[in-house]
Amino acid sequence: MLTVVAGLIQAQGKILVCQRRLGGAFELMWEFPGGKVQGEETPAAGLARELREELGVEAQVGAEIFRTRHRYAEMSEEMELIFFSVVVEAAAVRNMVFERIEWRGRETLAELNFLPADREFVGKLARLEMGARRPTAAG
């Protein structure tokens, strides 16, 4: 099973979300920053690496806050998606790979076209079932 990790990054009441690039897989769909765990990495180490690559930041990966499984028709294997609470310096966040990144209020997340694997988590955030008391980004 493929392990994929994603970070919930919050600053000043907003959540960082990322739009995939035009022309790539799942183009222009929204997601949380993160990616595939490689080799012998732990999920937390994989997320820290992905955040360096995608956002140019050193992250403090906190507690696991949500876990789900999903199978895309385009993929041969099921994936396990693990969300972590993450602390970064908000002012240091740079868009390194996405079409765009945005800081959004949880009440506006449902307006975005998220990847299917992220939608259950987005719903929980919108209903305030998680994330409200998680660590926030510095800055």
Pin down the residues of each PLM region.
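Conserved N-terminal beta-strand and adjoining loop/helix that marks the start
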Residues: 1-16, 36
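Active-site-adjacent beta-strand/loop module that shapes the phosphate/pyrophosphate-binding cleft
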Residues: 3, 58-59, 68-93, 102, ...
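A structural microfeature
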Residues: 17, 63-66
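Conserved hydrophobic "DFG−1" position in protein kinase catalytic cores
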Residues: 9-10, 17, 86-88, 103
